[in-house]
A protein has these predicted regions:
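Outer-membrane beta-barrel "beta-signal"
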Residues: 21-25, 29-32, 113-115, 159-163, ...
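Short glycine/proline- and aromatic-enriched beta-strand/turn motifs that initiate or cap beta-hairpins
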Residues: 19-84, 113-117
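Residues that define the transmembrane beta-barrel architecture of outer-membrane proteins
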Residues: 57-63, 83-85, 101-107, 114, ...
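Detector for outer-membrane/organellar transmembrane beta-barrel domains
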Residues: 29, 78, 84-86, 94-99, ...
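Transmembrane beta-barrel domains of outer membrane proteins
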Residues: 66-70, 110-114, 156-160, 169, ...
Length: 191
Protein backbone atom coordinates (compact mmCIF):
# COMPACT_ATOMS: atom_id res chain seq x y z
CA UNK A 1 0.00 0.00 0.00
CA UNK A 2 2.87 2.38 0.80
CA UNK A 3 4.39 1.78 -2.64
CA UNK A 4 1.09 2.57 -4.36
CA UNK A 5 0.67 5.74 -2.29
CA UNK A 6 4.19 6.90 -3.15
CA UNK A 7 3.57 6.21 -6.83
CA UNK A 8 0.28 8.17 -6.81
CA UNK A 9 1.96 11.12 -5.05
CA UNK A 10 4.76 11.02 -7.62
CA UNK A 11 2.29 11.00 -10.52
CA UNK A 12 0.30 13.85 -8.94
CA UNK A 13 3.50 15.87 -8.51
CA UNK A 14 4.70 15.20 -12.04
CA UNK A 15 1.46 15.85 -13.92
CA UNK A 16 2.02 19.59 -13.52
CA UNK A 17 5.35 19.38 -15.36
CA UNK A 18 5.11 21.41 -18.57
CA UNK A 19 7.22 19.02 -20.67
CA UNK A 20 5.31 15.95 -19.52
CA UNK A 21 3.99 13.68 -22.23
CA UNK A 22 2.47 10.25 -21.79
CA UNK A 23 2.60 7.67 -24.56
CA UNK A 24 1.56 4.04 -24.68
CA UNK A 25 3.53 1.21 -26.21
CA UNK A 26 3.69 -2.50 -26.89
CA UNK A 27 6.62 -4.86 -27.28
CA UNK A 28 6.83 -8.48 -28.35
CA UNK A 29 9.67 -10.90 -28.79
CA UNK A 30 11.53 -13.83 -27.34
CA UNK A 31 12.62 -14.46 -23.78
CA UNK A 32 15.41 -16.82 -22.78
CA UNK A 33 15.62 -18.42 -19.35
CA UNK A 34 17.51 -21.38 -17.95
CA UNK A 35 15.06 -23.82 -16.35
CA UNK A 36 18.00 -26.03 -15.33
CA UNK A 37 16.77 -29.12 -17.16
CA UNK A 38 20.24 -30.68 -17.18
CA UNK A 39 20.46 -30.42 -13.38
CA UNK A 40 16.98 -31.91 -12.97
CA UNK A 41 17.83 -34.79 -15.32
CA UNK A 42 20.97 -35.54 -13.30
CA UNK A 43 19.01 -35.49 -10.03
CA UNK A 44 16.46 -37.92 -11.52
CA UNK A 45 19.24 -40.17 -12.84
CA UNK A 46 20.97 -40.23 -9.45
CA UNK A 47 17.71 -40.96 -7.62
CA UNK A 48 16.56 -43.71 -10.00
CA UNK A 49 19.90 -45.23 -10.93
CA UNK A 50 18.76 -45.13 -14.57
CA UNK A 51 19.60 -43.19 -17.68
CA UNK A 52 17.38 -40.14 -18.15
CA UNK A 53 16.68 -38.58 -21.55
CA UNK A 54 15.27 -35.09 -21.69
CA UNK A 55 14.12 -32.29 -23.99
CA UNK A 56 13.55 -28.69 -22.99
CA UNK A 57 12.72 -25.22 -24.31
CA UNK A 58 15.40 -22.56 -24.17
CA UNK A 59 13.12 -19.67 -25.20
CA UNK A 60 9.46 -18.70 -25.48
CA UNK A 61 7.42 -15.64 -26.46
CA UNK A 62 6.93 -12.59 -24.27
CA UNK A 63 4.64 -9.57 -24.63
CA UNK A 64 4.75 -6.28 -22.78
CA UNK A 65 2.51 -3.20 -22.75
CA UNK A 66 3.65 0.01 -21.13
CA UNK A 67 3.05 3.69 -20.45
CA UNK A 68 5.95 6.07 -21.14
CA UNK A 69 6.03 9.34 -19.20
CA UNK A 70 8.48 11.95 -20.53
CA UNK A 71 10.01 14.20 -17.88
CA UNK A 72 12.19 15.74 -20.60
CA UNK A 73 13.40 14.76 -24.06
CA UNK A 74 16.15 12.67 -22.46
CA UNK A 75 14.58 11.25 -19.28
CA UNK A 76 11.44 9.11 -19.25
CA UNK A 77 9.75 6.69 -16.87
CA UNK A 78 8.08 3.48 -18.03
CA UNK A 79 5.45 1.45 -16.20
CA UNK A 80 4.75 -1.88 -17.88
CA UNK A 81 2.95 -5.21 -17.64
CA UNK A 82 4.54 -8.35 -19.10
CA UNK A 83 3.46 -11.92 -19.75
CA UNK A 84 5.43 -14.90 -21.08
CA UNK A 85 4.60 -18.18 -22.74
CA UNK A 86 5.70 -21.39 -21.04
CA UNK A 87 9.11 -23.00 -21.00
CA UNK A 88 8.66 -26.78 -20.92
CA UNK A 89 10.87 -29.78 -20.20
CA UNK A 90 10.18 -33.52 -20.55
CA UNK A 91 12.20 -36.26 -18.84
CA UNK A 92 11.95 -39.98 -19.70
CA UNK A 93 13.14 -42.81 -17.45
CA UNK A 94 12.51 -46.42 -18.56
CA UNK A 95 8.74 -46.32 -19.06
CA UNK A 96 8.06 -43.31 -16.84
CA UNK A 97 7.85 -39.67 -17.79
CA UNK A 98 8.08 -36.37 -15.92
CA UNK A 99 7.28 -32.90 -17.27
CA UNK A 100 7.69 -29.40 -15.93
CA UNK A 101 6.49 -26.05 -17.24
CA UNK A 102 7.15 -22.45 -16.18
CA UNK A 103 5.66 -19.08 -17.14
CA UNK A 104 5.87 -15.58 -15.69
CA UNK A 105 3.98 -12.31 -15.49
CA UNK A 106 4.44 -9.05 -13.67
CA UNK A 107 4.78 -5.29 -13.66
CA UNK A 108 7.92 -3.25 -14.10
CA UNK A 109 8.97 0.35 -13.49
CA UNK A 110 12.10 1.84 -15.04
CA UNK A 111 13.88 5.12 -15.66
CA UNK A 112 14.76 5.40 -19.35
CA UNK A 113 17.52 7.72 -20.58
CA UNK A 114 17.46 8.64 -24.28
CA UNK A 115 20.55 9.82 -26.14
CA UNK A 116 19.77 10.51 -29.81
CA UNK A 117 18.29 7.22 -31.13
CA UNK A 118 19.71 5.04 -28.35
CA UNK A 119 18.12 4.44 -24.95
CA UNK A 120 19.16 2.75 -21.72
CA UNK A 121 16.90 1.77 -18.84
CA UNK A 122 17.18 0.53 -15.28
CA UNK A 123 14.49 -0.23 -12.76
CA UNK A 124 12.69 -2.95 -10.88
CA UNK A 125 9.94 -5.48 -11.38
CA UNK A 126 7.42 -7.31 -9.25
CA UNK A 127 6.68 -10.68 -10.80
CA UNK A 128 5.02 -14.03 -10.35
CA UNK A 129 6.65 -17.25 -11.52
CA UNK A 130 4.24 -20.16 -12.06
CA UNK A 131 5.37 -23.78 -12.25
CA UNK A 132 3.57 -27.01 -13.01
CA UNK A 133 4.99 -30.52 -12.92
CA UNK A 134 3.63 -33.99 -13.57
CA UNK A 135 4.98 -37.49 -13.20
CA UNK A 136 3.51 -40.51 -14.99
CA UNK A 137 4.37 -43.93 -13.56
CA UNK A 138 2.67 -47.07 -14.88
CA UNK A 139 -0.15 -45.07 -16.46
CA UNK A 140 -0.92 -43.08 -13.30
CA UNK A 141 -0.31 -39.34 -13.49
CA UNK A 142 0.64 -37.21 -10.47
CA UNK A 143 0.56 -33.41 -10.77
CA UNK A 144 1.63 -30.42 -8.71
CA UNK A 145 1.57 -26.66 -9.28
CA UNK A 146 3.26 -23.81 -7.44
CA UNK A 147 3.58 -20.04 -7.76
CA UNK A 148 6.11 -17.72 -6.19
CA UNK A 149 6.19 -13.96 -6.29
CA UNK A 150 8.77 -11.32 -5.52
CA UNK A 151 10.82 -8.55 -7.03
CA UNK A 152 14.13 -7.96 -8.75
CA UNK A 153 15.95 -5.43 -10.89
CA UNK A 154 16.01 -4.89 -14.64
CA UNK A 155 18.48 -3.27 -17.01
CA UNK A 156 18.33 -2.86 -20.75
CA UNK A 157 18.67 -0.72 -23.79
CA UNK A 158 17.97 -0.42 -27.45
CA UNK A 159 17.40 1.75 -30.48
CA UNK A 160 14.24 3.82 -31.03
CA UNK A 161 13.51 5.33 -34.45
CA UNK A 162 10.22 6.97 -35.49
CA UNK A 163 8.28 5.49 -32.56
CA UNK A 164 9.49 1.93 -33.21
CA UNK A 165 12.09 0.24 -31.07
CA UNK A 166 14.33 -2.78 -30.92
CA UNK A 167 15.91 -3.68 -27.61
CA UNK A 168 17.14 -6.10 -24.99
CA UNK A 169 16.16 -6.20 -21.29
CA UNK A 170 17.56 -8.40 -18.53
CA UNK A 171 15.17 -9.26 -15.66
CA UNK A 172 16.79 -10.62 -12.48
CA UNK A 173 15.22 -12.76 -9.75
CA UNK A 174 11.89 -13.60 -11.41
CA UNK A 175 9.29 -14.33 -8.76
CA UNK A 176 11.87 -13.30 -6.17
CA UNK A 177 13.95 -16.43 -6.92
CA UNK A 178 17.67 -15.63 -7.14
CA UNK A 179 18.19 -18.47 -9.66
CA UNK A 180 15.46 -17.35 -12.09
CA UNK A 181 16.61 -14.66 -14.51
CA UNK A 182 15.47 -13.97 -18.06
CA UNK A 183 16.65 -12.06 -21.12
CA UNK A 184 14.02 -10.39 -23.37
CA UNK A 185 14.81 -9.36 -26.95
CA UNK A 186 11.99 -7.41 -28.57
CA UNK A 187 10.52 -5.23 -31.27
CA UNK A 188 8.02 -2.60 -30.19
CA UNK A 189 6.05 0.50 -31.03
CA UNK A 190 5.18 3.66 -29.11
CA UNK A 191 1.83 5.38 -29.79
Amino acid sequence: MKLITKFLVLIFFLTGHSLAEVKMGAEGGLVWADIRAEETAQILANASGSTVTYEYDEATWMGRIFADYAFSNEVHAELGYFLTGSLDATYKISGSQATESYDAMGIDLAVVVHQDDIYFKAGMHSSELNGAASLTIGGTKYSITESISGSGFLVGGGIELDDTRVGLTYYSDMGGDADSDMMFIYYGAVF
